[in-house]
Amino acid sequence: MKLLIDADACPREVLRTSLELGRRFQVPVWTVASFNHVIASDRHVVVGGAAQETDIKVMNLAEPGDVAVTQDFGLAAMLIGKGVRCLGPSGRLYDAERIDLLLEERELKARFRRGGGRTKGPKKRTAEEDRRFAGALETLLREWNG
C-alpha cells in the first residue's frame, strides 16, 4: 500500500500532514505535481504542465488497496474504480455513490458558468478542515496497518 498525493492544488497543511502520517505509519508517500510546484519529498514525481498530466501519472502509479488524496472528482472517480480509497483535502472520504453526485454537481455548475452564470469560489481553509483531514487519513492508515 502507498499513499498518493495529487499535489498540484493540494493545501500545504494537507501535504505536510500526509507526509508526517506516512512516516509514522511507515507507508510510502508519493507526491505528483507539475514542474510549477516545488515539493520536498523522497518520492516526488514531476510531470509537465499539460492538462491532466498529473492525473494520468497518479492513475499509472495507483494500485488496488492504495490511498489517494485529491480534490479532483474526476480523478477520484477513476481511482475508486481501480480499488483505491480516495480522500479529499477536507477529510471527506469519496465512495462510488458519493462521487457520482459530486460529478453531477460539478457538471451542473460548469454548465451554469458556460451560460454566463457566476458561482462562488472556494472558502478559505480552516483549522477544523485540517483536523478533520488528519483524523480521516489517520483512520484509513490505522485500518490498513491493522
Swiss-Prot record:
Pfam families: DUF188 (PF02639). It comes from the Bacteria. InterPro entries: UPF0178 (IPR003791). Belongs to the UPF0178 family. PANTHER family: UPF0178 PROTEIN YAII. This is UPF0178 protein Helmi_09130. It comes from Heliobacterium modesticaldum (strain ATCC 51547 / Ice1). The lineage of its organism: Bacteria, Bacillati, Bacillota, Clostridia, Eubacteriales.
